[in-house]
Structure formats: structure tokens, C-alpha cells
Amino acid sequence: MTLLQKEYNDVAYISGPLLFVNAASDLPNGAIVNIKDGNGKLRGGRVISVSDQNAVIQVFEETRGLDLATASVSLVEDVARLGVSKEMIGRRFDGLGRPIDGLPAVVAEQRLSVDGQPMNPAARAKPEEFIQTGISTIDVQTSLIRGQKLPIFSGSGLPHNELAAQIARQAKVPGHEGDFAVVFAAMGLTQREVSFFTQEFERTGALARSVLFLNKADDPAVERLLTPRMALTTAEYLAFEHGYHVLVILTDLTNYCEALREIGGAREEIPGRRGFPGYMYTDLASLYERAGVVEGKPGSVTQVPILSMPDDDITHPIPDLTGYITEGQIVVDRTLNSKGVFPPINPLPSLSRLQGNGIGKGKTRADHKNVADQLFAAYANGLDLRKLVAITGEDALTETDKLYLKFSDDFENYFIGQGDQDRSIDDSLTVAWGILSKLPQSQLTRLSKDSIDKYYGTKMDEMWKGGRSSI
């Protein structure tokens, strides 16, 4: 009898979604198994822990109806694998890679381990090519670079789903539009959110260049742990086998981490900070570090993970550990959202550590870096003056101070609050110059004289103030 035919019948006990099987130490960790009940019904599962005494299996479906005396386990695959193909573009799948769009299953060109292959650090190329998202605050002030991992920190009730859909719809690498693809993985979605993403991708035509993996809130927790790995395996295949520049959007990583905590609790592991497992940093790194550019390979994998910070706390373990691994952050702001500004991205706490690699002359525009610095300084000054006015009133302000107050309002309404507009980097810089031109030239200390001579005096346009289409 071979291992592939072997059945394990000594199920010791069942705890929630977990099966503990005795005398199964020869099962590979991470293997996919079938669990058969006394009536012959099969359920899928994954081995999540193996010791000398037993194996722990997370069941993909409910464990109701499983009996210790009649349940048996058999090996299906030594590791979780996904059948991948270029034909996956334009398709929708569930969190385990099964089609949910009513079309036949994809004919796999390869079956790849969802854990991926480690990327040789010596083979990594330096990320230095600009990705245009069409969103001014990101493109000008926290630029996304091909091969980067740049998370979005949001909060409960903020429009990060709409922002994710807008990035998926608009993102492109200038000059490489034909070989650009989006892999979108959403975890822990409500039925309303599933409908939103499905309709939004179809309505805007973004589905034609996208692969969607949608995991619902009522799906098993272990499926939530596999969903981003399914997405990243697909992205790596498209990038390094077919030369695509792939943007991977993962939302919401908070749901992923809570599934990690749920399984850790069921396994009776010793918890770490706020109940999350101590290995959460390593687990998140195994996702984030799959982004990058490889020497000699035409494609690339860029990641934009999105997470909602519990209680808007940026020191919470999930954003805290994410910040250690990734290369910056984009912060969605509740105050801006309450003013009706969309997308409500606050540039002051936002940062892209690789921005300097991919902007400037020959990449975006020569004045890009200086304009970003000037916008940051002027907006920060305007917000400080708002706090002062709240205490002392406007009587103590100079004329220049009043111009800075007006600048901060215009910056939020015209530059940040672009709505559903898809702006090129030139369009975004034009908007920036139109707002900066309301300040005296003497205040533009971060801009070169050549840039001021060329662009100062750009007229503002009411069309810059964006609106939002109703879905």
C-alpha cells in the first residue's frame, strides 16, 4: 500500500474546524487531504501541523457530521497547489481557486505550490520604474514603484474598497499597458462587498485584465489563509513565465490576521501581542516578500496590501508588523473622509521609501520630487494654521497665513479630492502647480527657479474637483 492510498482512521478528537489525527506523523505539513465521514461524504482539508504523535488538519468545510469512530483521512497532494494558466485573466475564483463565474475550470498549464519559490536575494533587481495609479496623492507624493510592496492603512467604515477598485481600474506602467495585469484577492467579504467588487470590475472593464480571488466571511478560516497565496502564485506565474507586470491588491489583511489568530486559538498556541500568534511577523513576511523584480526576467510583481487598523490604531500589531516588512504606507484619513473628500488619503503620514528610485527626469518629470516636497511643506503649514485659528481666530493671521489656509482647502478639494478621475502624472502635476500658484513665489522655497519660470501661474480649473459615480 502506497502513501497515496493510505487512510488514517485514528481521529483523536475534533475541536471546531480542526481534526487531530493520531499516528499520522508521515503526513507532510501543508498537505491537502480528503476527510471521509461514515456516509462516504468527502470534505477537503489541509495539514497545518505535524508532530511525532499526531497531525492537525484544518477542514475546509464544517465539521458537523464527522464522527471519531468513522472519520478517515487520506492524502490528496503533498502540498497545496494551484493549477495556473494565462487563461485565468478575466476570470473570478473563490479563495481556493475554484471558478465562481459560471465558466468551466481553467485548463492548467502548470500546477504550482501556493507557497511559492523563495526569491534569491542576489537575483533581485532594483525597483525603479514608476507605476501610475491615476490617483494624484499616490502618484505625486507616495509614488508606487514596480516591484515595491506599499500597503494602504485604512480604518473601519472608510472607503478602502472603493479605493482598491479605483487602483485596480486605473493602474498602469506607462509604455507597458499591453502586458500589465491585476491580481485582486479579497478576504472576509460580506455578500454586499462581493457584489460591489464583481459589479465594479465588470462595469468598468477592469475584469478584462484582472484575476479575482474572492473569499467570503462565511468561508472557513483556513481558506482565508490560502487566498493571498493563491493570488501571489498566479501573479508569479504571469510575471515570471509570461512577462506580465502584475499589480497584486490584497484586501483586507486584517481579516487574514484574525483568521490566523482563530486557528492559533483552536490549536491552543501560546498567544502573542493582543492574542495574535507570535509567528505572525514571519507569516506576513512570507506574503509581502513575494513582491519584486528579478534580474533577467521581463515581468514583475508589485503589491498593494490593504488593511483596516482596529480602532484606527497604527501601533496595532497588524499595521505595526506590516510597516516593518513593507516599503512605506498610504494612510486613509477619517477626518478627510468626514469632509466628503475622496479618496481621503492623507499625504502627511504617508510615505513611499522607494519613490526616489522611480521619479524625476526621464521617468516622470524633472520637477516631480520638488513639487511633492513643496506640497507636503505647504499643506503641513496650512494644517498648523488651522489649529491656531481654532484657538485665537483669524485676526492674528498675516496675509501670507491666510493664503496658506486657502491653499490647504484647495489642496484637499482639488488635489486630494479628485473623485473618480483618472489623472496622468502630468495632469496631477498640473493640478499641483495650479494650487501652488496661489502662493507667493517667495514661499516656494523647495522649487527651482527654472520650474517656477516654466509652470508658475498655471490656472486652476473647477473640473479638477472630482465627483464620485454612484455604483
Swiss-Prot record:
Keyword set includes Aminoacyl-tRNA synthetase: no
GO term, biological process aspect, one: proton motive force-driven plasma membrane ATP synthesis
Keywords, alphabetical: ATP synthesis, Hydrogen ion transport, Ion transport, Transport
Superkingdom, natural source: Bacteria
Transmembrane segments: none
Keyword Ion transport: yes
InterPro entries: ATP-synt_VA_C, ATPase_a/bsu_AS, ATPase_F1/V1/A1_a/bsu_N, ATPase_F1/V1/A1_a/bsu_nucl-bd, P-loop_NTPase, V-ATPase_su_B/beta
One Pfam match: ATP-synt_ab
GO MF assignments: ATP binding; proton-transporting ATP synthase activity, rotational mechanism
Family under the similarity heading: Belongs to the ATPase alpha/beta chains family.
Annotated function: Produces ATP from ADP in the presence of a proton gradient across the membrane. The V-type beta chain is a regulatory subunit.
Name the record gives this protein: V-type ATP synthase beta chain
Organism field: Deinococcus radiodurans (strain ATCC 13939 / DSM 20539 / JCM 16871 / CCUG 27074 / LMG 4051 / NBRC 15346 / NCIMB 9279 / VKM B-1422 / R1)
Taxonomic lineage from the root: Bacteria, Thermotogati, Deinococcota, Deinococci, Deinococcales
